[in-house]
């Protein structure tokens, strides 16, 4: 027992010995908080579910009473207003939320959804912030159907490189030249020069790594999204490129939802611990996954931030991981992992809200 709650032993062990340490939250405060939350919000949750059930019952009866009749849109809309399903639009207002992550407030990009019960999928999603344009073009039908030849197809690879240069010409045009003909990228007088020529929009050059005269990488930005040119003349691609360009990496999945709801089936405390463990590892930054690929052991972990030097010579870093969201279970489901003072299953969403917020404190304390 934890206060007036009956909690599955595995969940207790996870909360007290793995999750709470280093958060600054004591075991007593956590369980007291969960107990208080359940007492306060369970009646509200049930009230909402009753209201939903009543509305659904009225809507069902409307349709049953009109079986075989043509649909009357205006009458149906009027009925939905009458029962309170539809309400009048309110006055316009300004959102006052501050300190919102740019991935939410100002940058547009893809978002992934992955099950919280699969650490490998979660790592893939978190690391999907960056992707190789070369790999994406080569490995899909964007460049046409694959030939049957085994191994690296040089012809296809050449078409990929040419297509990537078209992208660079469109996003980062050079005054009087094309990226397809470039032999050298370097930094001089706080700007990127490409065969001694500047970009049409020099402000799109954000930074570089390595030697400014022969950088390892160049960081560019277009429409709010970063692009990294990777140079490596020892690389299989870079060795055949006159500028030594081995890859073009682009910002891809800006955010990812770690899902506790639709894509998982968590039926007891053991399942919840599995799901919460993934979120804990993501928040602490130490999540790993081991698997075999082509007969070799692979250990996957979270990517580290990317470091660069600004045009003015200052060191800075940018995010290498997607902004992570957590999707808790909604209002309907209950879980046997925790029973209230009456011996009833608690609403799973209340448990999720308490636990995932507490786990998120590991990340907040690192900031």
Where are these regions (language model features)?
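N-terminal-proximal low-complexity accessory segments that begin disordered
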Residues: 1-87, 95
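Catalytic alpha/beta active-site cores
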Residues: 77-78, 82-367
């Amino acid at each position: 027992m934890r206060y007036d709650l009956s909690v599955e032993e595995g969940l207790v062990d996870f909360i007290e010995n793995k999750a709470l340490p280093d958060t600054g939250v004591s075991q007593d405060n956590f369980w007291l908080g969960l107990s208080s939350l359940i007492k306060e919000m369970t009646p509200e949750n049930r009230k909402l579910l009753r209201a939903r059930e009543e509305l659904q019952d009225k809507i069902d009866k409307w349709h049953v009473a009109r079986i075989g009749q043509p649909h009357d849109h205006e009458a149906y809309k009027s009925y939905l207003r009458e029962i309170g399903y539809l309400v009048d639009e309110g006055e316009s207002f300004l959102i006052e939320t501050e300190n919102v992550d740019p991935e939410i407030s100002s940058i547009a990009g893809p978002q992934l959804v992955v099950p919280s019960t699969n650490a490998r999928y979660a790592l893939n999603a978190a690391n999907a912030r960056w992707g190789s344009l070369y790999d994406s073009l080569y490995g899909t039908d964007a460049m046409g159907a694959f030939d049957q030849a085994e191994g690296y197809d040089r012809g296809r690879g050449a078409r990929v490189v040419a297509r990537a240069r078209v992208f660079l010409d469109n996003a980062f045009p050079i005054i009087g030249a094309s990226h397809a003909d470039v032999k050298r990228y370097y930094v001089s007088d706080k700007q990127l020069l490409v065969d001694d020529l500047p970009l049409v929009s020099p402000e799109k050059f954000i930074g570089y790594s390595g030697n400014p005269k022969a950088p390892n990488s160049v960081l560019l930005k277009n429409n709010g999204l970063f692009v990294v040119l990777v140079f490596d003349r020892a690389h299989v691609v870079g060795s055949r490129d006159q500028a030594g360009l081995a890859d073009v990496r682009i910002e891809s999945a800006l955010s990812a939802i770690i899902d506790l709801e639709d894509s998982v089936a968590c039926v007891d405390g053991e399942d919840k611990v599995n799901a919460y463990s993934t979120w804990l590892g993501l928040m602490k930054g130490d999540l790993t996954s081991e698997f075999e690929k082509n007969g070799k052991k692979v250990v996957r972990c979270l990517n580290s931030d990317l470091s660069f030097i600004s045009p003015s010579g200052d060191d800075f870093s940018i995010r290498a991981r997607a902004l992570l969201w957590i999707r808790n279970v909604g209002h309907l489901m209950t879980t046997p992992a925790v029973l209230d003072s009456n011996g009833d299953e608690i609403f799973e969403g209340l448990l999720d809200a308490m636990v995932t917020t507490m786990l998120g404190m590991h990340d907040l304390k690192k900031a």
